[in-house]
């Protein structure tokens, strides 16, 4: 299984609407990727205002191939939604779940 973590740095003076991210943006991702290997998603919100990331979205896929096919098919529409909830540039980590 593959986990794609999209991490939004906690940058002073930047905007991040966690409610939009957790509902509308993640909803859009599910709409586009549920039939393309997306198994589930999680949204983490920083518990401490000084945390290095304000929020992290985790997307779980059956395989790297399914992630790549689904993501690249719908990347333009999903990334076009980012300005609706933030002006932070996200960092991405793709991991293979070992255990």
Residue ranges and their predicted role:
Residues 1-99:
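Macromolecular interaction modules
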């Amino acid at each position: 299984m593959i986990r794609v973590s999209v991490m939004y740095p906690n940058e002073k003076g930047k905007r991040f609407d966690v409610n939009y991210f957790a509902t509308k943006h993640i909803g859009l991702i599910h709409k586009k990727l549920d039939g393309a290997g997306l198994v589930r998603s999680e949204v983490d919100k920083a518990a401490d205002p000084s945390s290095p990331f304000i929020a992290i979205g985790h997307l779980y896929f059956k395989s790297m191939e399914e992630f790549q096919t689904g993501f690249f098919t719908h990347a333009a529409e999903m990334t076009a939604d980012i300005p609706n909830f933030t002006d932070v540039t996200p960092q991405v980590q793709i991991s293979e779940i070992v255990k």
